[in-house]
């Protein structure tokens, strides 16, 4: 695209070759609002997000030493894939997911139905702006591919710090 005021010509563009990840991202955004998935399109979007975030989530979680008795919060839990992966390691602890999309909460609960039914996990509808937990509740807090959706990052990080135990770990 020219910025010199002469307009655009066909020769100004070259054919673009998209990677699989770029195509997946384009499909996500064409199907609705990734910030707050809604309706049937939102459910499909969450399924694709679970798939497209798989590798980065695995890498990020590999940086943590998850203990069996950890109490972990996943902010912006989306379709619940990260919670599911952490549930493999948390045996005596507890996992909590929170998302402000009701479709995300519903999908995450379905993805993790066994852990939810066993009382090992709960998934709540809520916002990072006002986390419904006591101070110093969680050993670890994670957010996967959702920080850029937070409405007021500086204030929201203070809220994360409030519910994170002293010496706890926040994985962003």
What are these regions (language model features)?
Residues 79-91:
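Conserved SAM-binding loop of SAM-dependent methyltransferases across substrates and taxa
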Residues 41-61:
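Conserved SAM-binding loop and adjacent beta-strand
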Residues 117-129:
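Conserved SAM-binding strand-loop segment of SAM-dependent methyltransferases
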Residues 101-103:
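Conserved SAM/SAH-binding beta-strand->alpha-helix loop
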Residues 140-152:
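A short SAM/SAH-binding and catalytic strip from SAM-dependent methyltransferases
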Residues 154-166:
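A short glycine-rich, Lys/Arg-flanked "PGG" loop and its adjoining helix->strand segment in the class I
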Residues 129-141:
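A short acidic, Gly/Pro-enriched loop at the edge of an enzyme's catalytic core
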């Amino acid at each position: 695209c020219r910025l010199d005021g002469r307009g655009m010509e066909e020769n100004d563009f070259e054919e673009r070759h998209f990677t699989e990840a770029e195509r997946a991202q384009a499909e996500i955004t064409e199907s609705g609002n990734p910030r707050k998935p809604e309706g049937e399109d939102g459910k499909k979007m969450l399924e694709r997000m679970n798939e497209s975030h798989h590798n980065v989530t695995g890498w990020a979680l590999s940086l943590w030493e998850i203990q069996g008795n950890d109490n972990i919060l996943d902010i912006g839990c989306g379709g619940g894939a990260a919670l599911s992966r952490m549930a493999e390691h948390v045996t005596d602890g507890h996992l909590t997911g929170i998302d402000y999309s009701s479709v995300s909460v519903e999908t995450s609960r379905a993805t993790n139905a066994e852990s939810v039914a066993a009382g090992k996990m709960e998934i709540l509808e809520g916002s990072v702006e006002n986390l419904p937990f006591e101070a110093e509740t969680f050993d670890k807090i994670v957010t996967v591919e959702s920080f850029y959706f937070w409405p007021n990052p500086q204030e929201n990080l203070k809220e994360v710090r409030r519910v994170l135990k002293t010496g706890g770990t926040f994985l962003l």
